[in-house]
């Protein structure tokens, strides 16, 4: 009996671990948008969120932005599971959100890239510290582009999804939401 209880306590503990591995609760990110507003990653709880690390000077990032825009456009009005312990729930929330974290040094370059690439979502932050970014340190970023897909509870469910791979994972969760609605 003691062994079973210890095992269950260990499972419970792992379910609330904050970290950057799949299954962990994603670390909080707080920052200032290009327009000066304060935002937090936790404000997006209840939605599927892609935390996307990029920079204006990163060619692969800029290329991937085109794919990301298509994904956002495709999934913006779809129902996804929502809420605490979302697996198996029928409650849904519309849309898919992107929380962009830039490793730029120049505010003007960062803002210009957002405009040029048409990254029209409101969730953009940068501490303008390049590779010395506190955000990069928290998420252990060593190269970009890099991203983390979070479920509605803020848990990391996938990492480094690009293009069709991201679309396929989102489609899987959207399909799950629609199945649950029919039950």
Model-derived regions: residue spans:
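N-terminal "domain-start" segment that seeds a small globular fold
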Residues: 11-42, 175-176
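Structural cue for short, hydrophobic secondary-structure segments
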Residues: 50-54, 100-102
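Short, internal strand/loop/helix patches
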Residues: 99, 104-148, 152
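Thiol-/selenol-based redox modules, centered on thioredoxin-like
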Residues: 143-144, 149-183
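Conserved redox-active cysteine motifs that mediate thiol-disulfide chemistry
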Residues: 45-46, 53-74, 79
């Amino acid at each position: 009996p003691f062994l079973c209880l210890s095992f269950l306590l260990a499972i419970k503990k792992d379910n609330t671990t904050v970290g950057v591995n799949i299954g962990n609760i994603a670390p909080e990110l707080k920052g200032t948008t290009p327009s000066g507003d304060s935002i937090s990653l936790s404000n997006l709880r209840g939605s599927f969120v892609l935390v996307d690390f990029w920079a204006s000077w990163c060619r692969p990032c800029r290329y991937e932005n085109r794919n990301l825009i298509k994904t956002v456009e495709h999934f913006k009005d779809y129902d996804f599971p929502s809420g605490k312990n979302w697996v198996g729930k029928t409650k849904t929330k519309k849309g898919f959100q992107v929380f962009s974290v830039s490793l730029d040094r120049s505010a003007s370059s960062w803002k210009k890239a957002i405009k040029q690439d048409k990254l029209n979502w409101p969730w953009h932050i940068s501490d303008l510290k390049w590779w010395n970014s506190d955000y990069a340190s928290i998420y252990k970023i060593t190269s970009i582009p890099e991203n983390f897909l979070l479920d509605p509870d803020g848990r990391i469910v996938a990492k480094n999804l690009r293009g069709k791979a991201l679309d396929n994972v989102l489609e899987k969760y959207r399909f799950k939401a629609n199945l649950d609605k029919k039950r």
